[in-house]
Amino acid sequence: MPLPRGFVQPCLPTKALEPPSGEGWLHEIKHDGFRVIARKDGKRVWLYSRPGNDLTYRFPLIVESLAKLRSRSCIIDGEAVACEGNGMPSFDRIRYRRHDASVFLYAFDLIELNGDDLRREALDTRKATLASVLRRAAPGLRFNEHIEADGPTVFAHACKMGLEGIVSKRKTSTYRSGRSPDWLKSKNPACEAVRREEEEDWGR
């Protein structure tokens, strides 16, 4: 089955035995949600799942917010996340509600902007451009912040907070579809989301 027009197969992290330490890495929280490739062309917006299925109808707030971006066109990689009242991500909420207006896109990479392919740019450059694109964005879009610190320390804090884990990325890495050794995921074994992902292969 052919992939949809404008869909880019996402870059996927490789499972790590332990988080990387040392310089040259960005560490992001691993959210418990749906991986989304978002494409905007003028006022039209499409949302695709990791394998390329159409998710556009499911997340109206994300679609509305993307349509309001000032950029003419873009392709953004991120995670659609629903949060409970305590601020913690809720996968069940996002999975079982067919139309949820309270799901946000945590954007962590910019693949294309106004017709320019950014995949050969370094990650830290792409993220800086993404932050600029999302400045004053509508409520459905959130820039996924990163931390430049010791990986094991960041991971330990994420586990204490009950989060799913972290994704560590080389600052100089380019964006390439499929599994990448430059993106490493470290998962909290005590987290229910991790056990579910092992069984069902959701998320990133």
Language-model regions, residue ranges each:
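Catalytic cores of nucleic-acid ligases and guanylyltransferases
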Residues: 1-204
